[in-house]
Structures are given as structure tokens and as C-alpha cells.
Swiss-Prot record:
Keywords: Ribonucleoprotein, Ribosomal protein, RNA-binding, rRNA-binding. This is Large ribosomal subunit protein uL18. The gene is rplR. One of its GO terms (biological process) is translation. Part of the 50S ribosomal subunit; part of the 5S rRNA/L5/L18/L25 subcomplex. Contacts the 5S and 23S rRNAs.
């Protein structure tokens, strides 16, 4: 019997394999979602470095958000990561949702990052 954790890992593995096939070495926008916060990183897999990162725990956002676990917080993080990525000279990325379903907070973050100037 598959446990929820095993199902999540299976979805995550499928998503990452798809990104590796279609990404062609492009920069990856990776999302991690916890119960209380949301985190996002812009990662260069070829060199193994993180180029930009943002989360609901950043000082710029933490005081302005009522909680880090809602769509508004995810949208704020999406806008912040778009600003930081553009400052680092990155405009085109591949969206890595991990094992998370593209809905709710993950979708809100992605839409805000697109509005901020990232293309994926």
C-alpha cells in the first residue's frame, strides 16, 4: 500500500525527470511548501549553485504578512523572487513544483513570479 509520503516522492520524481528532459540545462525555479511557510529558490543545476532565494521568513515580507501559509503570502514571495532573479540577470526559468499539485499556494506563487517578469 502506498503511503502519502511515497505518493509525494513518486510525483516529485516524475516532475523532476520531466524537467531534466525538457529543461535543456535551463535555470530551475524550485518550490518548497511547508504548513507555515513557502520557500522558493532559483537554482543552476549545471554549476550546482543557488542564484536567488526568497521565502515568507524574509525580513522584507515577514512583518507585512499576517501568516506565511496563505495565497497572499505565496504571491508576495513570487513577486520577491522575480525581483531578485531579474537583479541577478535571470528572466527565463523552468518551474519545478516538486511533488506539489499546481494549485493554491503553488499556483499563486507561479502567477506572481510571471507577473514580476519571469517566463516559464
Amino acid at each position: 500500500m502506498m503511503t502519502p509520503k511515497n505518493l509525494f516522492e513518486r510525483r516529485k520524481r516524475r516532475a523532476r525527470q520531466s524537467i531534466k528532459k525538457k529543461g535543456n540545462g535551463r535555470i530551475r525555479l524550485s518550490v518548497f511548501r511547508s504548513g507555515k511557510n513557502i520557500y522558493v529558490q532559483v537554482i543552476d543545476d549545471l554549476n550546482g549553485v543557488t542564484l536567488a532565494a526568497a521565502s515568507t521568513l524574509d525580513k522584507e515580507l515577514k512583518g507585512n504578512l499576517k501568516t506565511g501559509a496563505d495565497k497572499e503570502a505565496a504571491a508576495a514571495v513570487g513577486k520577491l523572487i522575480a525581483e531578485r532573479a531579474k537583479a541577478a540577470g535571470i528572466t527565463e526559468v523552468v518551474f519545478d513544483r516538486g511533488g506539489y499539485i499546481y494549485h493554491g499556494r503553488v499556483k499563486a506563487l507561479a502567477d506572481a513570479a510571471r507577473e514580476g517578469g519571469l517566463s516559464f
